[in-house]
């Protein structure tokens, strides 16, 4: 009996070798410096902002180097799989401007020469590599029951020892092939563990592309590589997949940093080169005066659906995330206001080593900048696409007056300081409702925002006087001259210096008169340019309201 017999008993139908797969999945023919990266989620839930953050880093590094960005689905834990999670991942990344060069394209479809890209369909590949390790005596079947493992763990903790299956506690590590075969033939359950070559006296030193040099004790654990159900553990599948798919860089959350010694050791035992690693900081948020991890349970903004429902343009979210990835992006954007964000080069060594702080106020500022640069036609299209799903009443109203709405979305946009009225589409209704009688007529007296200097009766007198003077067919300068004439007749100042010098001689400023007109037409104290609003509304609508 030998290791060969043991390997053949465990995997009787596996006739392929690692060499076969190395030939089947050759090195990629890419230019020097091109990076191959992946987004590799587990389909155990719907996408969150941390996933978009990680995916964006991988996508930018791949594509800015002329490389490959692919989607792999890590579905070895099929009990936790959520229906629709794969399609949600693909849709989410597409909506945020990230399309995969290869990999999974749907629940049951994929593209690319390194398929399959779903781990549950790669079982025979993993088995071929495990069979090879068994042949070489580098892995072994472990027959410890869950009860034995729990008892061992309790004993180790009581004795203040590191819990786990290693060294003297690896009960079946040195079991002979003959004895292992007997147990398997007797029907005993088992997992397969890799024999760790780790030395308790040594440390593993590695270069993390974000954190710099990192150092850990070598891994001593004989980690499970094939579970009782025959599927690989994440650790082993990751090593095999990244090797065969020719991944050059693995960018993942810093919660995986402690697993780095295990993964580097696996590549060593497999006899293959490890990819380069970078561990990105956890997304944090301020909670009072302290920081904490962004929570799927506590924080609605952790879910990608939050940004769709609120109506943040995907470009806004991307540009905000680029700010988190590299703080230098903000300066670059200021210097290149009209450039495509793809022109910015993401650099890992300039990324914060500590937690990335997520700030909705900052996101809103970024989003206002993004939207204010959009052409009115683009704003119209994006807004109506959003409203069709999330605000059907506004969708019907806005699309019924398409030409007018494109004018509305262009108010005060073409000057040196364009208005920044909204950060997300759910704010649009409040900003433009007064263009629609259907919404304006629902307002009550309590909704009307008068200038603080005016009482209601005085505002009514102003409107009565202005109604007589109003002329639709004038340019802006003439319109303002007419407004000032009304102001003077009613005792309001048109010169701020004179008003400040003798305020008791006037009821107020011409701005108060304009404020009364604004309130009559819009019910709001703060709107875009009043003359432009009136021209867009049209003479009939204006006269009806004043």
From Swiss-Prot:
Q: Which family does it belong to?
A: Belongs to the class-I aminoacyl-tRNA synthetase family. Glutamate--tRNA ligase type 1 subfamily.
List this protein's GO terms for biological process.
glutamyl-tRNA aminoacylation
Location comes to: Cytoplasm
List, alphabetically, the GO terms of the cellular component aspect.
cytosol
Catalyzed reactions per annotation: tRNA(Glu) + L-glutamate + ATP = L-glutamyl-tRNA(Glu) + AMP + diphosphate
Which intervals of this chain are the motif 'HIGH' region? 41-51
A Pfam family this chain is assigned to: tRNA-synt_1c
Entry keyword set: Aminoacyl-tRNA synthetase, ATP-binding, Cytoplasm, Ligase, Nucleotide-binding, Protein biosynthesis
Organism for this UniProt entry: Clostridium perfringens (strain 13 / Type A)
Q: Which GO terms describe its molecular function?
A: ATP binding; glutamate-tRNA ligase activity; tRNA binding; zinc ion binding
> What is the designated name of this protein?
Glutamate--tRNA ligase
Q: InterPro entries attached here?
A: aa-tRNA-synth_I_cd-bd, aa-tRNA-synth_I_codon-bd_sub2, aa_tRNA-synth_I_cd-bd_sf, Glu-tRNA-ligase_bac/mito, Glu/Gln-tRNA-synth, Glu/Gln-tRNA-synth_Ib_cat-dom, GluQ/Sye, GluRS_core
Q: How does it assemble?
A: Monomer.
Motif 'KMSKS' region location, chain numbering: 293-297
The enzyme class is ligase
Major location (coarse): cytoplasm
């Amino acid at each position: 009996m030998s290791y060969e017999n043991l390997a053949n008993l465990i995997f009787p139908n596996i006739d392929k070798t690692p060499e076969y797969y190395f030939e089947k999945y050759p090195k990629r023919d890419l230019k020097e410096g091109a990076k191959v990266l992946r987004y590799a989620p587990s389909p155990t839930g719907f996408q969150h902002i941390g996933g978009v953050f990680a995916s964006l880093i991988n996508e930018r590094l791949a594509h800015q180097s002329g490389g490959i960005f692919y989607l792999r689905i890590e579905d070895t834990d099929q009990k936790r799989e959520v229906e629709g999670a794969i399609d949600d991942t693909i849709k989410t990344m597409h909506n945020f401007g990230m399309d995969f060069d290869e990999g999974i394209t749907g629940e049951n479809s994929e593209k690319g020469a390194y398929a399959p890209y779903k781990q549950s369909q790669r079982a025979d590949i993993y088995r071929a590599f495990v069979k090879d390790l068994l042949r070489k005596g580098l892995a072994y079947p472990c027959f410890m029951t869950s009860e034995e493992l729990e008892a061992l763990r309790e004993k180790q903790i009581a004795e203040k020892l590191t819990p786990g299956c290693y060294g003297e506690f690896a009960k079946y590590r040195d079991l002979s092939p003959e004895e292992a075969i007997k147990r398997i033939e007797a029907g005993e359950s088992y997992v397969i563990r890799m024999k760790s070559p780790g030395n308790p006296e040594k440390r593993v030193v590695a270069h993390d592309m974000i954190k710099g040099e990192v150092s850990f004790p070598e891994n001593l654990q004989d980690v499970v590589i094939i579970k009782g159900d025959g599927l690989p553990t994440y650790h082993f599948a990751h090593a095999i997949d990244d090797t065969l798919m020719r991944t050059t860089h693995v960018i993942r959350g810093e919660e995986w940093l402690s697993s780095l010694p295990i993964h580097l050791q696996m590549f060593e035992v497999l006899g293959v080169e490890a990819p380069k690693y970078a561990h990105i900081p956890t997304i944090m948020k301020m909670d009072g005066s302290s920081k904490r991890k962004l929570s799927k349970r506590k924080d609605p903004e952790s879910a990608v659906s939050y940004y769709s429902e609120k109506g943040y343009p995907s470009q806004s979210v991307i540009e905000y995330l680029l700010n988190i990835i590299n703080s230098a992006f903000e300066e670059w954007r200021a210097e290149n206001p009209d450039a495509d964000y793809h022109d910015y080069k993401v650099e890992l060594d300039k990324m914060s080593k500590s937690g990335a702080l997520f700030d909705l106020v900052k996101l809103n500022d970024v989003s206002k900048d993004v939207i204010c640069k959009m052409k009115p036609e683009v704003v119209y299209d994006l807004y109506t696409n959003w409203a069709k799903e999330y605000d059907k009443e506004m969708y019907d109203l806005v699309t019924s007056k398409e030409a007018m709405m494109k004018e509305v979305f262009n108010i005060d946009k073409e000057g040196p300081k364009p208005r920044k009225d909204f950060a997300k589409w759910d704010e649009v209704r409040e900003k433009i409702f007064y263009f629609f009688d259907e919404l304006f007529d629902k307002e009550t007296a309590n909704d009307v925002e008068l200038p603080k200097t005016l009482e209601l009766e005085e505002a009514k007198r102003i409107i009565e006087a202005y109604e007589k003077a109003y002329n639709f067919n004038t340019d802006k300068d003439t319109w303002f001259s007419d407004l000032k004439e009304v102001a003077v007749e009613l005792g309001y100042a048109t010169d701020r210096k004179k008003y400040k010098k003798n305020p008791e001689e006037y009821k107020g400023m011409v701005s108060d008169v304009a404020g009364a007109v604004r309130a009559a037409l819009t019910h709001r104290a703060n709107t875009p340019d009043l003359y432009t609003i009136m021209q867009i509304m049209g003479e009939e609508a204006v006269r009806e309201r004043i």
